[in-house]
Amino acid sequence: MRKVLFILFLLIGLTASSQCISNQSSTLIPAGPYQPGDVVTINYTLGDFTGINVNWIHAFQINLGVGWTNLTPILTPGNPFGSAGFWLWDLQNTYPGGFNFGPGWRFVNTGNAGWGTSSDGPFTMSFQITVAPTCTPDNLSISIEVFDDCLTGGWSNGGCCND
C-alpha cells in the first residue's frame, strides 16, 4: 500500500526585495496531506509590486519539489493599468541578457520586449499540480519567485536587481 505523502515544506518565496512586494496570499485546494495522484490547485495573489527606480515586474517562476508533476496553468495574471502587452505561460525562456526562466508566466511588453509591466497589481494567478506516483515520502515544496525587469536584463536602474 502506498504511503500517504506529506509536505516536506511549503514555501511561497520571492526573489524580489521585500520593499518591492507586499500583500501576498495563497491557497492550496484541497489542503494536505496528499497521496499519489491527488490534484492540487494553487491560487496566488501578489497584491502590490512597487518597483524602485522604475523597476517593473517581469515574471513569476514556479518551482516545485520532485514530488509534484503535471504543472498546468489555469488563471493568467492580470495587468491592471499596466503597459501594453500580455502574460505568456512559458516552460523555459532565456532572456537576452542570459537570465534563464521557467516554468511560469512572463510578461511580453509589446512596446519594449526587454521591459516588464508598469502595473502595480494586484496579480492573481492559479495553477494545478499532481502528486507524483511514489512509495516513499517526496519533497512537495512549492515556491513562486517574482522577477523584475532589472534582474531579467531589460532595465539597469533598479534597487531590487541583486535580490
Predicted regions and their residues:
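Hydrophobic beta-strand residues in large extracellular and virion-surface proteins
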Residues: 26, 40-46, 60-62, 125-131, ...
